[in-house]
Amino acid sequence: MEKPFELAYTELKKGCFPEELSFRTTAEIKPLEGVIGQERAVKAFDFGLAVKMKGYNIYMAGPSGTGKTPYERNSTEKLAQTEPVPYDWCYVYNFQNPRSPLALRFEPGQGKQFKEDMAELVQLFKTELQKAFRAEDYETQKNTLEHSFDEKRDALMAEMSAVAEQYSFQVKTTNAGVFFMPVVEGKAVGEDEYDDLSEDVKNKIEKNSQMVQEKAGSIMRELRDMDKESKRQTDQLDYKTGMFAIGHHVNAVQEKYQEYERVISYINAVQEDVLENISQFVEEEEDGEDSLASLLPMLGKKPAEDVTLKYKVNLIVDHSDSKGAPIVVTFNPTYNNLVGEVEYDSEFGNLTTDFMKIKGGLFHKANGGYLLVQAQDILSTPQAWEALRRVMKTREINMDSIREQLGAVVAPTLKPEPIPANIKVIMIGSSYYYELLNEYDEEFDKFFKIRADFDYEMPRTDENIRKIAQFIKRFVDREGCMEFDVSAVCAIVEYSSRTAERQDKLSTRFNHLAEILCEAVTWAKLEGAELVTAAHIQKTIYEKEQRMKLYEEKLDEMLEENVIMIDTEGAEIGQINGLAVLDMGNYAFGNPSRITATTYVGKSGIVNIEKEARLSGQTHDKGVQIITGFLGQTYAQNFPLSLSCRVCFEQNYNGIDGDSASSTELYCILSSLAELPIRQDLAVTGSVNQKGEIQAIGGVTHKIEGFFDLCRKRGLTGTQGVIIPVSNVKDLVLKDEVVQAVKDGLFHIYPISKIDEGIELLMGLSPGKKNKAGNFPANSVHGRVMKKLKAFDKRAQGEEE
């Protein structure tokens, strides 16, 4: 057997050394501007900001901590400062349809000015109208008008009385109108006396009554017409007087806002309503302090402020102090927070509202600018996505109540006029949320036409290493903390590479790096150091791991006490050491696991015990099926594959998924069939395809370190090691203690590309090559396996016969 190829210690990690950098401390370099390693995302995002057409909202996808939010804020703020300030918006009373307040648009700052101008105008209405209607000239005109009609009324009443008297009737005037009372023997007769009269007298009265009603009818019509004319002329006088008093003030306001056609129309409507309701401005209070009305306001007149309520202005968007386009960030996108709401007052159990209780939402604040939201917040808040998609689709802000959206019965409410929306929505979230929204809403692509994908890693180039140093400098300047020396920067670069799990990559999850920087500064302070060094970085990483490795230590204890059985010496048939990664959320570690296989005569094929126990995931099940394909392709070309096999991850109670153990399981099955023992001082990881090629897997660094830690605690023998796919060599970023053990020849890492390479390493026997007849050498591993499978097939056929 030839000596197997193994990796040199120099291939197990890629170091970063101070001589590679051109500074001694971060004090000598400039802080970072922008983001690192996100060229594709930056290009997409900047293009999305530049497109102003409908549907070009932006979804920023990628894992947290890659710089999405800071870049979004910085880029958006820079652009927003160069863009125009959007319109102010006001809601005002709708005199034609009070249930639908009108939305008025103004240039920035003019909304606030209009509100003040209208308040001042209404105050002028009060003072000028009271002055005009208390003036002597008005009183003279009104008295003259009233006197003229009084004379005419008296003349008509006298004529009516004469007609009534002619037929023995008397005219009586009450609040209810004009009545005719019969006169008998010079005395007016009431209802009681009328019943006592004789029938002849009654008949005469009835006859005369008809005559009176007939002749007095025309006079009554004249009286009614005269009263109407009196009111018309009085109203005309009031209108003329009121117009003279306030018209020039109204004209002044209209002239100020002459460019706004809808505002002019609204002011005209205000003027007409005021002139039609002049009495509410000029009548004096009649209720005293002790009146019932003062004790129970709901039974008396409305408070004075209610008189002018409908002339007020509800300014819901004010940009008087704004510079550039607005940027609104929300982490609580409830329906009401987004679209706004109409508030209510409760008065004696009744809900009341008016247009002044309309409250603008985040859409109103962001209109003409940018709304920044988190996908998770939108998806976890009821009706938030529906509100957002409706604004993006209709380009209107419609303030429907959430109860209406849910179909609930609500109290009568207002229907404010929708406001045109011009909002660029920028949503931040993971790729998972993007796919979820895309699946959930078939129009999602129409709303978010730009996707900016932020990568979790970047190439390990000199330029990116320099930018990481600048990132550290930016952290130092922002936090006002001590500087980092060049060794600390090198340690951070190595940590970044380890986080990316690639020798040729660096992590872009800078929130993780920032945590290390923050804690390293603290350790340096506790030691009284002047600079943060590599030792502080290493201590930070060590202490961080110690805080989170309780579960790992519990497993280690069970391994040491042989509660969990793993052999690291000797050899066993049908038994092998597999490797898995346990992910605890913010901490992951490698964990060795014993895998066993048993084979016997039968036709049930390979049975995955994990699957039978419902502890296996779909990807692991697929890996088991691939093993069946390999066995059939390799051995069963000339006879049927008659085999029963059970494969098990021993002492696994938490479930397993992934195909990274498929090669390991295959070795175990081959060992059982060939009756050849497998070395227990080696652990194996790697996926296999149906052609026997070893494929890359994830978490190779953690897996190696997990088996190494177990071997080190039990004592390194010099023969122990791990078999990995050759395609994973670039992923190795091992700890220094593993690198040193390999350097000292105490631990070994074997990269392989074919299943046959692992067979020879594990079983110490040549796998054998198939000849033209389709057979393997008898004393090879494959030959022994084929012999056993043929024997199984014969027995199976014999049992059938």
How should each PLM-predicted stretch be described?
Residues 1-438, 443-461, 465-486, 490-526, ...:
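Conserved ASCE/P-loop NTPase catalytic core
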